[in-house]
Amino acid sequence: MKMKIDILFTNTAWYEYLEWLEKDKIMYKKINELLKDIERNGTLHGKGKPEKLKYRKGYSRRIDEKNRLIYDIENDVIRVLSCKGHYEE
């Protein structure tokens, strides 16, 4: 059964998301696909090689080789922490 969840962005993640919308529509669409997949499959299953972060709270999924979608989920809310760059940078 599909979860009904809300999606919230941190300020930084929102600006990154809008930057993708403006500069690279393909990446923007990939991020949206990953968010839909999280809603369908939960935190650790589905597209983008989902994994739990080792040294901080949250999860990541690959957008591409250089960029990760970093997020956590609490009380049926996906909180997007970052959608540009890599969590190790």
Where are the language model's segments positioned?
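A short, surface-exposed loop/turn module that caps and links secondary-structure elements
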Residues: K36-R62
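Enriched for short, Lys/Arg-rich terminal
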Residues: K2-I7, T12-K29, K47, R61-R68, ...
